[in-house]
Structures are given as structure tokens and as C-alpha cells.
């Protein structure tokens, strides 16, 4: 018996800080500190308590907590670096500079707001039109006052940048490069102060050539965008209260031009309609490592205040898995710390060209005191060593020697064992998907160079007498994927129920309810959560199917900080009031009725979370988010975002985890496992797939080979699904080889459901089907994309028309609604819900 919960208004009527807020801030602070990466330290850090500090940079008092757009969070307050350093007992000698900058900042913010309001007022659509103006008009920080010399012992400079949804960054001053004002500030700081520390507070990578100019920059930290506890977490690292343990999840090139797609990415070549993935597999470290291009800071790199030594105790082949047992000891004498053990593999060259090394496993120790050690067991499943053969339509292991490396970064890793395979073997037989419709010439290595590098590597393994594990192809079982149509991938009980619903209700359920969340009467509508992204239709409420609420992420729940209830209804507020912490509603008259407060936790952005390399911590954060979802009646969190960092100028990289699919998949799985510990709550992994460009994101076509698509851009989603079974997937706006991702049966049904065993629901990104006739609601249903969001009457018209003319089958529509119903039944809108992962 399923009992729908009694409905209620979310939030509290008391504006006092709650126990939940205080406890969750602690988790956010811990995560922020653990994800910050110490890139350089010439003995200056940590600083002693009470050290006099000259603090400069726009991020000093206006620290960027996160990106803009759907990834923003309306928290109660954010702790700036200035506040955090004062809280930690440091003396700030540049109070006047900071006060002057704050005044300039406020004036610039209001001018920016007015510019957006004025431009948006000219447009007919005041919702999507406003957001388009907002997302393509980035806020530019004002310049601070001239630097002056104080009696500080150390100067700290905070380099900050804002990025967000809807627009890519530029390789120009004020974005990837320093402005002339910033160069002058940094030059003055380095001339006036003997000891200088720089922190990079940006959503993506930035040019660091200034590090080559100033020898007295003695420490460099990558703090990304650390969430609401930014300042306290920064002070924890600077003071030594927390020892840095973050590691890079990207490769920081010496110069932007070193990235293989730097000339053609997004607007760089003037073409935002088609994005040719000519670098193929060679994304991030796979390129730099394979082509021997030096980097400034490499993948997996990060310093500590202490030192570690990791020994490989054993490497064995067990049940067709490589099992590596390691022991890590803190060899320092002062600071406790954590270390990340990373395993890489070099795969043999056969018919398929391969990257020189790929990440295949990682784990992080607990906090180790000086002299303390910890043993860990890492496993490498055979699928982590496979490559995709388009010719065979299969994941294959090619004959030869697979060299396993261990280290605490890619650069520091060294060979530790070899797996010898006696013959080629197919691990998984699939069908081809997403075929190219035009020629694509991918980057290739010199075959002679490959042969030389591999020969030298194998010679080294023989000279060192590294252990060799023998694997016979005959002992490897081949899995042959069974493919089913969209209409066949259906939960039986839900399908029986759906057969009882009218066509009118089926069509209504196929898209979100456009009226929810604004002025809804709780007596006649579903639960409405102001600031949430949307709600599914509750047209079948009398049949036992309530609407469920979906809230944006991925840096926490994005809701309105407060709203009013008047005469039993939520007072309607424009969408823009949920942006920028309420900047666009300042000066508006007070609303009538009772005020309710819903403060959510702003956790660090995705990149910083991934830089922790700590799946246990990420799972803890996920469970924390799930608790807030329950408190605010949210079933689906529209997160985590897990697209690949293909180029550092992608405007949305801050939301995403890494240039590496294993990191992206593992972190997303951990976040999902945490959220879904909370009964009836689930994640929505996104954006599926190849959403690596924000300019023209609604119409950009990603031209990519099937092998690259599978090994780089789909692999993270595959890992997340097989290791955590998220409730939902969100498709992306872009096309993949000429087919809109939202209308792509190859990815939605063949890959996600048939190959990876996805059991949940798939939804579109917002307004995907409202951009033209080549992406339709009916196309979504045929592809196995179950829910069109946020919902428009034009979607219903399209579905009804195609049901009548037979273009859309009733079986396809019912299959999609069955999967939606199956998720709603397991949601927190029912009494006695259980964690989703426990539902068979």
C-alpha cells in the first residue's frame, strides 16, 4: 500500500540559524580544504598564527564561491578569504584597500544588474530571454586601488574569475590571462613584499606565466571555487590546521596553445555550430603524456606539508582482476596528512593505437600521523584495460604486455608489475552507435615513436624483474550484450498501472508541469518549492501519482532563500529572483503574508570536490545533500554534472570533475551513493553527452568518432551507472554526429539501458524541445528519453499529433511513462520510502 505524504510548505518561519546549517557547514569546510591543491611551496607554508598579512586581489573579500547559472546556490552567507583569515587569528594590514575595493565592487554589481535588466526588457520572452542575457553578460570584477607597502610579513594575492552556464570563456585578458591592472598589482606586490603567496580562485584553469617572472612567489594554491566556507577552509590550509591533500584532476599546460584543440575550440575558430573532436582519445594528460609535451602542473599532482612513501606489497591476478596491495607511510616528522595512491596502465599496441598511460584505479589514505602507515587494496578490473574496436563493435584486450604503474601523480608514477596476455580477446560484444556522418581525421602518434617508447618500457620492466601475471585469453569470458527496444525496457508493475491511464494523462505525464512552483495552491496542486527547477505533472494524483520536485545543483540545492505565503498560496516571484543571491530583487516591495526561509548549503564546485580524490568524503557530502532534499521536499537533484574537461575554456568546467573519465565516473558514483542513502532521494547525472561547449549549446553538433565517444565521453557515465545506479539521467542540448542527444536512441536506450543496465528515468534539459523542429517531444519518447522538462503545451501538441498520425507508437509512450511512474513510486513523496539502491 503506497501512501502519499501530506503536503506542506517548505522551509521554516524562524530565520535563526539551524543545527542542520551549522553541521553541514562543517562538512562543506572540510571538503573545501581537502580539495585545495598546493602546487608550489618553498617552505613558506604553513604560516604561524598571528602573522601579519597584506591581502590583495578581487577574491580577497569577494571570494568566488561558485559559478553562475543553474550551478549557483542561494546560501545564507559565504565566508570570504578576508573573513576566514581574520577568524584564524591572522592580522590583515590592508584593511583600507579591501574597504575601498568593496565599495567599487558593490557599484560594479549594481551597474551590471542594471545592464542586464535593460537589455532583457527589450526582449519578448522575459524568462528565457532574461537568462540568455544574464548568461552571456559576465560580471567583470573592478580593479582595486594601487598596491601600497605595509608592515606585513607576507603578501597573499587572490586571482579570481567568474564563469557560468551559457557562455564559454576567452583566451584573453580578464579571463584566461591577467589584465594589465592585475599584472601591475602583482608586480608591485612582488617588489614591495619579500614573501608572496598566490591563490587561484577560478572556475577553470588560467594562465600562470607570471610564476616564471617573480621568484618571490614562494607558494601557489589552486583553490578553484570552494563554496560557502571558502575563507575558513583557505585559512585551515594556510595555517597548517589542515595539511593539503588535494591533487589535480586536470593537466595545467605551460601555455594555452599547448592544448590540442586550442585553435578550434568553441568560438576560437569562429565556428560554434560544429565542434570537431579531432584530438580523438588525446584529451588532457592522454595528449601531453603520449606526445611528450611538458606541462606546468600535471595530472594527479599536489604537494603536502609532509612526505609519504608508498610501497607495492603485492600484485596478483585474482578472478580476472589485478589486485594491488600497497602500504603508505607518513615519512615526515611534524604534520599529519593524507596521500592519494594512483594506478596507471600502459596497454600494448596492436591494431588499435592507444594513449601512453591511462588512470585505472585510485584510493586515498586516512589521516596519517608522522610514522603512521596504512595498507590499501586497489583492484583493476579487466574492462579498465580494454579499448573499443569500431570494426569489431567490441571492447577488446589486445595481445601483449600491460604495464601497471603506481605513484601519487602521473609524473611520479613508476612501473610495478606486468600483465601478459597471450592472445587478443573480446571482453564485451556490442553494436555500433552514433555513426559519423562526415569524415573526421583524428590526431595520431608516430608509429615509430610508439614502438620505441614501448620497447624501452618493457626493457625497463625486465631489467627491474617486475612481477609478471599471466592471463590466458581462453580464461576470459566474453559478454554479448542483449539489445532491446525502448518499448521493451519497461518495469512490469509500472507498465500494468500505466495501461489503466487515459491517453490525455499519458501525454500530460510525458512533460513537466509548467504551472508548478509559482503561486500554486497546496490544496489543489503538488508540493511547490520556490526556486526549484520544476515539477513533474500531478494529473494522475487521484490515481496515486503525485508530482515530484526537481532542484538544480551541483554545488548544492538551488532554491530561493526565502519566500512568502499569503492566503494559503505561495506568492509568485519571477525566476530571476532566484539568481545571484537575490541581487535582482533588491529594492522590490515586501511581499504580503508569512515569510518562510530555506537556506541550503553551498558546497565546493565539482572540480574542487574531485580534487579531493576521496570517494568516502564525496559520499558523505552526497548524504548531506540528500538530507536537505528531504527537508525541502525535493526528490531529484539535478546533479552531479560530469562532462569531461575537454578544453579549459568551457564555461561550465567548474561544475564538472575532470579531464579523465575514471575520476568523473567514480566521483559521480560516490555522490550518487551518498544522496541515495536517503530514502526516496536521487541524483540526475548530466549532461548526457558531449556537452563540452556552452556557446550555441542548443545547436552545437559534436563530431566525434565512436571509439572516442565511448572511451572518453560516455565512459564516466557508464562507471557512474554501473557503480551507483542513479535515479535519473539528464540529456544534453547538443547534437552528437547530427542527432540531438535528447532524441538519440543509441545513447539513451542502447548504451545506457542495454549495455550498462540503467534502470532509472531519463529526462531532457530545460526547453530542449522548444528550440526548433529537429528535436521534438515525440523524438524523445522514441529514443527512450522519458520526460520532457520543464513542460510546455507545444510538447503535448506534438505528442498528440504524432500519436494520431502513427509516427509515435503508444508502446513507446507508455514505456517512458512506466519508467517515470516507477521512479515516482520510489520517491520521498510517499510514506515509508526506502533508499533507492535497495529497491530491486
Language model features: what each stretch is:
Residues 412-429:
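Short beta-strand elements
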Residues 1-387, 396-412, 430-840:
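Glycoside hydrolase catalytic-domain context in secreted enzymes
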Residues 393:
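Extracellular/periplasmic metallocenter environments
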